[in-house]
Amino acid sequence: MLSRALSQVQPGYGEAPADDRVQTLAYRCSVPFAGAPRVITVVGPTAAGKSALSIALAHETGGEVVNADSMQLYRGMDIGTAKLTSDEREGVPHHLLDIWDVTFPAAVAEYQALARAAIDDVLARGKTPLLVGGSGLYVRAVLEEFEFPGTDPAVRARLEQELVSSGPAELHERLRVSDPVAAEKILPSNGRRIVRALEVIELTGQPFTAALPSPTPYYPSVQIGVDRATDDLDERIALRVDLMWQAGLLEEVRALLPLGLRDGRTASRALGYQQALAEIDGDMTQDEAKADTVRGTRRFVRRQRSWFRRDPSITWLDGASPTLLADALALTR
């Protein structure tokens, strides 16, 4: 899907004078802003039912799915990411699945460019793009004006070494002094984000928050959030993890080892994969690995909810409601 999306995007498509946001949106969509084709987003926590809703919406709207799950971007990481099989996609075109090797470090800036190319391609063919996933930063990077500062390998390597030697708490305190607002938004345990924030501050001389998304939309969009009662979601997570192991997660991980999974800074830390590696290495029993995956996923769900609930443009629907599809369709019309 990625190759098709990129090959069909015409050179210069989507470029327009930068001094007029309305003109830019109208130009990219080739129609006046008020009636511009919209991107439909389906977001929410893990296991809430986003994928099922997106397939149903795609059938009703003539839509195509653009993946916004950061782990489903990785080739061969299928079972542990709950990636839909070809049959489960029911003929709905999906973009940005299986595009990165497991050794590739997650790069929001690269994802942004690829996702916008895919969305522009879908719009150019008169279809509806459905941006679907639980990676909040990836979604915002696509939907909003968000320019990424450059990187410096030497600065990044030095900060990552400091992270190893000093721990995330010390670097988080340094971030708090340099950019209190960013420190409030980044968990003290999130070493990768802390390192990136400090790198941006050092390279630009500006607060990291200056690089965060602005509320100015890049695309007109309808944002649908899918969630469930916590007890219901907890049960679904536990069942999903159990089914992951039954479906052959360990075999999937073993097959990825020769491809460099252990060296993948992002992929090797993915929920389920990190624990499966520990089981393979004898550091955890299977029961311990599964229990740790459940706990980690529930913690991740809390972070997802915290991120998405701050966005007032998302309309929330109950994933367990029998009228979920009808309610979602009503929002798109």
Where are these regions (language model features)?
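Phosphate/pyrophosphate-binding catalytic cores of soluble transferases and nucleic-acid-acting enzymes
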Residues: L2-Q8, G12-Y13, D20-R333
